[in-house]
Amino acid sequence: RIGHAYLFCGTRGTGKTSVAKIFAKAVNCEHPVDGSPCNECETCRGITNGSAMNVIEIDAASNNGVDNIRQIRDEIQYSPSSGKYTVYIIDEVHMLSIGAFNALLKTLEEPPAYVIFILATTEPHKIPITILSRCQRYDFKRISIDTIAARLSELMEKESIEVEDKAI
C-alpha cells in the first residue's frame, strides 16, 4: 500500500532526494520490473531529466511562504496528466514558515488519492508534530566506506571485472 505522505530525514548527502525520485519513478513507471522502475519508459526518462509534469520538486529554503503551499493546494485538485500519481518532493521542509506548515497540514489531512508528498529534511526536530504525525518517517544514514568498498568488490566479481584492491 502506498502512503500519501513520507518524511525522509538525514544529513546532507545521504540520498533523500535521490530516493524520492526513484520512488516517484517506481509509482509512475509504465513498465515496472518487480516493483522497480524500468528507467527506460517515457515517464522514467522524464523524471530523470526533470521534465516530468507529475513530479514537482520544491526547495522550501527559497519557497517557504504560505502562498507557495497554497499554490500546491490549488494544483493538487487536478489529476496527473501522465502516470498514476503526482509526487511533490519538498526539500529542506524544515525551512517552511509557521503559516506554510499550517497550509501544508490542511493539504496533508485530506489529499487526493493520486497525490504523494515526500518531505525531506536535515532537521526533523523543526517540523511541527502535527505534520510528523501524518507522515511515514524514514531515517537515512551515511554508508561507511568499508560497506561501499565491499559492495563494489562484490559487483566487480559478479560482473567478472578485474580490479586492483587499491582502486576500490
State the predicted function of each range.
Residues 1-133, 137, 147, 153, ...:
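P-loop/Walker A NTP-binding region and its immediately flanking N-terminal helices
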Residues 141-168:
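Conserved C-terminal "switch" segment of AAA+ ATPases
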